[in-house]
Amino acid sequence: PLYMDVVTALANAGKNDIKVIGGRYGLGSKDTPPRSVFAGFEELTKAEPKRQFTIGIVDDVTNLSLEEKPAPLVAPAGTIACKFWGLGGDGTVGANKNSIKIIGDHTDKYVQAYFQYDSKKTGGVTISHLRFGDKPIKSPYYINKADFVACHNPSYIIKGFKMVDDVKPGGVFMINCQWDFDELNHHLKADAKRYIARNNIQLYTINAIDLAIEIGMGKRNNTILQSAFFSLAKVMPEEQAIQYMKDAATHSYLKKGQDIVDMNHKAIDLGATAYKKIDVPADWANAVDTKPAKELKGKPELVKMVKDILEPVGKMDGDSLPVSAFVDHVDGQFELGASAYEKRGVAVSVPTWDSTKCIQCNQCAYVCPHATIR
């Protein structure tokens, strides 16, 4: 509508020699980062720019999309960008909201936070985008390159999520896992290894999973990981951050008892030193995947849909899909039975049936929506 208004206004004024182009953005609720905006301005420099265009998507059907190149960093100097990949319900989002409040209340820095959730909500993927800086932050878009990226669930590494691609050269990548180096070397994909080695990424691991169980916090390891973040990101002096975190924990949990408060204080103290730096091998720069790609079986049209659409979307890489991937699904209908291919493996531990303790009440069979015990 704005394009039509401008063209009409110029035509009514008799100024027909002015070149006007217009485009659409935010299609399908897509993010609009600086590289998309830069693509629009670059199109204007061409002798014959497209009158109508789209940005933010790869439109290989109508060919109206513009080529997007990596844009220069436009944030003010000194702005620190952090990105956290969590699991819905694990406390990552709550901890990051707490971090933003601590930094905003106790420093002179400007703060900004965006949070992404997938459709599964609890148990689904969450991505937290935090920015801190000494100057006002005018970045109404998600973080594309971060100084600090944290993976709070090891299954994302196994599945091949492209998290490390978000780290700036020389930045920090922290993985929450129970693995030693050999296991980490086995699970990391070759493209992630190459990026880490070639861009001098500072790689850290932290076993907040076992540490939380040891302290008595169960699955709630967000406090440990939050403490590790403040220690590694250097957004503010570590001692101050730890004290502010303890004050916040006391305020939040005192009504639940002093034991809960002490437990959180212990988690904060331990988390600040629980991480380990990984010495990145030089041969990672030329790493190649030796494991063959998993072969999917089933109806050809279903397998095609799983490979072309379901798998990239499951890895939070759906924004990279071209329009042509959906040509066979223009009416919104998709093949049935795709859930059989979606094995997310997000659980750190799985239950086993102990026949010596089972009284055969059958409650587990009818409570479980998948009746896995059967």
What annotation goes with each model-predicted range?
Residues 271, 353, 358-364, 368:
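Short cysteine clusters
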Residues 217, 221, 350, 357-360:
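Secondary-structure capping and boundary motifs in well-ordered enzyme cores
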Residues 325-352:
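Short, charged low-complexity linear segments at domain edges
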Residues 337-339, 363-374:
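Iron-sulfur cluster-binding cysteine motifs and their immediate structural context
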Residues 30, 36-109, 117, 121-122:
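Active-site phosphate/pyrophosphate-binding segments
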Residues 1-4, 8, 13, 78-88, ...:
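Active-site cofactor/cluster-binding pocket
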Residues 21-23, 28, 49-67, 236-254, ...:
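Internal, active-site/partner-interface "lid" segment
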Residues 1-34, 38, 46:
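C-terminal non-catalytic interaction/assembly regions of soluble proteins
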